[in-house]
């Protein structure tokens, strides 16, 4: 399995699709199908039935998964979208690096 370029908690921007230009925080990543759920992006309305536990039915808004190829990480230094690379530090740790500025991405 490849190293994760986008992780939970990262700030990302959508680069293509109906939500192009939207920014948000990654809520979850699904490595099996290469998708991520981003807060406030790709929101769909879902109709739910009431259940026996007392939960109300109705229309709820839910964030839908977006393919990772449609997302770019926001550079922590410049605030602009950037590609992600990897670097091995002197202490042997492998860290993510913003390609545009060379800044280490925490997370």
From Swiss-Prot:
Protein name: Large ribosomal subunit protein uL24
Function: One of two assembly initiator proteins, it binds directly to the 5'-end of the 23S rRNA, where it nucleates assembly of the 50S subunit. One of the proteins that surrounds the polypeptide exit tunnel on the outside of the subunit.
One cellular-component annotation, GO: ribonucleoprotein complex
Keyword Repeat included in the entry's annotation: no
Record note on quaternary structure: Part of the 50S ribosomal subunit.
Pfam families cross-referenced by the UniProt entry: KOW (PF00467), ribosomal_L24 (PF17136)
Keywords: Ribonucleoprotein, Ribosomal protein, RNA-binding, rRNA-binding
GO MF: rRNA binding; structural constituent of ribosome
UniProt GO BP: translation
Source organism: Gluconacetobacter diazotrophicus (strain ATCC 49037 / DSM 5601 / CCUG 37298 / CIP 103539 / LMG 7603 / PAl5)
Residues that span the membrane, as ranges: none
UniProt record similarity statement: Belongs to the universal ribosomal protein uL24 family.
NCBIfam families per UniProt: rplX_bact
SUPFAM superfamilies, per the entry: Translation proteins SH3-like domain
């Amino acid at each position: 399995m490849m190293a994760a370029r986008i992780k939970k908690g990262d700030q990302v921007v959508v680069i293509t699709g109906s939500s192009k230009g939207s920014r948000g925080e990654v809520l979850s990543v699904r490595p099996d199908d290469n998708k991520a759920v981003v807060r406030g992006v790709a929101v769909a309305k879902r109709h739910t039935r009431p259940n026996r536990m007392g939960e109300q039915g109705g229309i709820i808004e839910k964030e839908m998964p977006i393919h990772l190829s449609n997302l770019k990480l926001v550079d922590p230094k410049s605030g602009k979208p950037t590609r992600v690379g990897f670097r091995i530090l002197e202490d042997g740790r492998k860290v993510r690096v913003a390609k545009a500025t060379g800044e280490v991405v925490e997370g």
